[in-house]
Amino acid sequence: MATGPRYKVPMRRRREARTDYHQRLRLLKSGKPRLVARKSNKHVRAQLVTLGPNGDDTLASAHSSDLAEYGWEAPTGNMPSAYLTGLLAGLRAQEAGVEEAVLDIGLNSPTPGSKVFAIQEGAIDAGLDIPHNDDVLADWQRTRGAHIAEYDEQLEEPLYSGDFDAADLPEHFDELRETLLDGDIEL
């Protein structure tokens, strides 16, 4: 490790590869709440966060495991569940009085058509005003999960174990999306 009077130890969260402080500062300067989109292999999370005097304050959040409360039976780490998680977070943000936000993807790569942009698309469809480029959003059929259903039809054995059939994923997605957008449920 480097030593000497000119060596500067990076901040802890930068050393752990958890925070890009230059990007964070640019997002905070906008003065708008941040739509924090985080993904893992099994789940996705969407939070609307503002800067507070004692750290960040969460105004609204949704986790892909929350979708089970509304009837989601498919796995929670795919594109359709990312979109629905963003939609749910956007609806909860609307209830909290948030109207606009900026997307914070953290250290995730800004790959067009990825799950973080599916979260953004869901929040936009919920009514949030988020500046974006339409080129980064995935094709609607991919967001619905049609690519998963097509892959399942090619397999000899079912893609998912259990009662859920992956061939029904686009229809299941449409049903839950309509349920969330109708507003007949408690968020």
UniProtKB/Swiss-Prot annotation:
SUPFAM superfamilies: Translational machinery components. The keyword Cell cycle does not apply. It comes from the Archaea. GO terms for molecular function: 5S rRNA binding; structural constituent of ribosome. Keywords: Ribonucleoprotein, Ribosomal protein, RNA-binding, rRNA-binding. One of its GO terms (biological process) is ribosomal large subunit assembly. Gene3D superfamilies: 3.30.420.100. One of its GO terms (cellular component) is cytosolic large ribosomal subunit. Part of the 50S ribosomal subunit. Interacts with proteins L5 and L21e, and attaches the 5S rRNA to the 23S rRNA. Has been cross-linked to L21e. Belongs to the universal ribosomal protein uL18 family. This is one of 5 proteins that mediate the attachment of the 5S rRNA onto the large ribosomal subunit, where it forms part of the central protuberance and stabilizes the orientation of adjacent RNA domains. This is Large ribosomal subunit protein uL18. The gene is rpl18.
